[in-house]
Every structure is written in structure tokens, then in C-alpha cells.
């Protein structure tokens, strides 16, 4: 499987599909190693989609002497795109960290970003979001991965979906499994997320941008995503009123695809 020496670490990546270049990044996990099945249906039919393991999880290593920041993770992506010779890439950033990385790349290297989609994102942390993110880390550190997994899962899915799918959401093959046994990587993700602040820089984003607001999100609610729509020049916004932090279930996934794919085609 492909790896490259990027920005002082070994970076694992996969490319799925054929077509114009796109990159899809999520939160504290990866779409690699079979996770591509969670991509928007039809995305890899139309695009060459780059997926990565963030430093410290999966098959990517990390240099713990380097302080974590969203700029560091963005520089990893920039280095990999330069390594691949990719420019003019559709950036799809979902469920937190991937969206924030996309913002940083769009600001630093506009030549790389053809368009940007943000969902579950923020321009900077308020006290509420900061304390939530810190609590996720505290639970993982003090009570273990299983307690963290249950905590973050009940915060990320609608009650009805959780009740019907609890057995597949939890456990060794459940959500956030990449963090199991990797508390230090998780802590570094949290530090980067908490310190992310592009409030005064988003005015420099040049690419077409779509911000998707999740009306039932308990972590990155419209409180944190609506400022992105206001601060990014020309940004468009769409609200999915009944969606929590994670798009889940057949109906939600179809509606998400029906928002995402036509918008990408227009840009």
C-alpha cells in the first residue's frame, strides 16, 4: 500500500475511483483500510478520491517532538498533494478535523483547492466546544477507550439511530476504532482542534465553498458552522435539519449525496 515521506513522517494514503481529483477527510479516524465504503455513494464513480491516515493513526507514523496543530496536518496534506503532482482538487471535509484542515489548505495554497465542502466544522473554538473536546480526551485517558467510544457515539448520532444500531456502533469494529490504544494520537488531535483559529483568515479563501449545517449536531452545531458561511467570501450554506454530528442511515445518506454531488459538478 502506498506511503510517502511527507513533512517529517511516513504518510499512508489510498486513491479510489477515476476522474477529477478530490480528497475526503473526516474527523478522528480514517476512510482508508475499507473505510471507503463510508464515502458518499457515487463519489468514486466520478472522481479520483484521495484518502489519508492522519499522522499517528493507521499506517502513518508521527514525530512526537513536533507540536500538533491544524497547520501541521494541513502541511501534511499539502506535501502529499505536491508529491502526487495534484492541483485544483475538490476538498471534502467532514465531521470536524478534516474540514478544519481543508480551511488551512485553502488559505495557504489556493492553487491546490478547486472547491471546498465543510461540515461539522468551526472557525475557532468557543468555551463550549473547547470543553467538549477536552472532555472527550479526559474520558479516554481516565476511563479508557470503551468509555470514550460510548460517550462520543451518543453525542454523534440521533437517539433513534443509536438505539437501532448500538451493536455495530460500539466495540472493536465500531466508530473511532483507530483511536483504540492510541490515546497519545487522540490527545494530539484534540490539541490541534482546540487551537484551530482561522476567524480572521477565512476572508482570504478564494475557492467556491459549501457549508453544510447539521441541525441536530450536539458537537458542531449551526452555532459553529454558520460563522463559516458568513466569513468565507461567496460561501453557500445548506441546512440538514434532522442530521446529527454524523450523517447516518439510508435516507440521510441519500439526501447528503443529493446535496454534495450536484454541487461538486457545478464547480
Predicted feature locations:
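Short beta-strand/loop motif that positions the catalytic acidic residue
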Residues: 205, 211-213, 217
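Conserved alpha/beta-hydrolase catalytic His-Asp/Glu region
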Residues: 127-129, 146-196, 200-201
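Catalytic active-site module of serine/aspartate enzymes centered on a nucleophile-bearing elbow/loop
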Residues: 235-267
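Active-site loop/oxyanion-hole signature of alpha/beta-hydrolase fold enzymes
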Residues: 50-90
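Conserved alpha/beta-hydrolase "acid-adjacent" motif
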Residues: 218-224
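Conserved HGGG/HGGXW glycine-rich cap/lid loop of the alpha/beta-hydrolase fold
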Residues: 5-62
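Acidic beta-to-alpha connecting loop that harbors the catalytic carboxylate
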Residues: 28, 215-217, 242-244
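Flexible "cap/lid" loop of the alpha/beta hydrolase fold
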Residues: 103-107, 113-143
Amino acid at each position: 500500500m502506498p506511503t510517502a515521506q511527507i513533512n517529517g513522517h511516513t504518510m499512508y494514503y489510498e486513491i479510489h475511483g477515476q476522474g477529477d481529483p478530490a480528497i475526503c477527510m473526516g474527523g478522528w479516524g480514517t476512510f482508508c483500510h475499507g473505510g471507503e465504503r463510508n464515502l458518499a455513494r457515487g463519489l468514486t464513480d466520478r472522481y479520483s478520491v484521495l484518502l489519508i491516515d492522519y499522522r499517528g493513526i493507521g499506517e502513518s507514523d508521527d514525530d512526537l517532538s513536533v507540536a500538533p496543530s491544524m497547520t501541521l496536518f494541513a502541511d501534511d496534506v499539502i506535501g502529499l498533494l505536491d508529491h502526487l503532482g495534484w492541483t485544483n482538487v475538490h476538498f471534502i471535509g467532514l465531521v470536524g478535523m478534516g474540514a478544519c484542515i481543508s480551511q488551512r489548505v485553502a488559505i495557504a495554497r489556493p492553487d491546490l483547492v478547486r472547491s471546498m465542502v465543510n461540515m461539522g466544522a468551526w472557525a475557532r473554538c468557543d468555551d463550549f466546544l473547547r470543553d467538549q473536546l477536552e472532555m472527550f480526551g479526559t474520558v479516554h485517558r481516565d476511563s479508557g477507550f470503551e468509555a470514550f467510544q460510548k460517550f462520543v457515539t451518543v453525542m454523534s448520532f440521533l437517539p433513534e439511530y443509536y438505539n437501532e444500531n448500538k451493536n455495530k456502533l460500539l466495540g472493536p469494529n465500531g466508530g473511532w476504532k483507530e483511536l483504540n490504544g492510541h490515546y497519545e494520537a487522540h490527545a494530539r488531535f484534540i490539541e490541534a482542534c482546540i487551537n484551530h483559529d482561522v476567524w480572521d483568515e477565512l476572508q482570504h479563501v478564494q475557492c467556491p465553498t459549501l457549508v453544510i449545517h447539521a441541525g441536530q449536531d450536539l458537537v458542531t452545531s449551526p452555532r459553529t458552522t454558520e460563522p463559516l458561511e458568513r466569513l468565507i467570501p461567496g460561501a453557500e450554506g445548506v441546512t440538514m435539519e434532522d442530521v446529527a454530528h454524523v450523517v447516518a442511515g439510508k435516507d440521510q445518506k441519500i439526501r447528503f449525496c443529493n446535496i454534495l454531488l450536484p454541487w461538486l459538478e457545478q464547480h
